[in-house]
Amino acid sequence: LSEMKEIYFYTVNPDNLETEAVSAVVKSDFTDDPNDLMVLISDSLEDAGYEVGIKSAELEGENVVIDFSSGMCPVSGLTEKEEKAVLDAIAQSMLDNLTEQNGVVFRIMGEAYESENFSFGRDYVYMKNHHK
């Protein structure tokens, strides 16, 4: 029987659109790979009603780069408040678990993040790691 451990990350409470901490029990050999983390975060957001379209989550230099698919949540179909809550939950989850990374960058299909509500440069750091 393999050892288990608990990891913490964030999701969105659909009732008040606040980010809230949740946890999942994973095998102790669960690595802090951004793609593995993204699966947990996506599943949790999907439970809250936000089906996130992720192309990839990878380390790029000192940042974690989350590349979203176009035409899906959080890029389209959300209010500004919902979109911000989803982005905050993803960014905070990444930084809390990948403590060596400096920040989180969001892109759409490898390009700058531009949605109905937000527009960020291709290398804009959305959230910086306050643990560093």
Walk through the language-model features, giving the residues of each.
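Bimodal "functional hotspot" detector
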Residues: 1-132
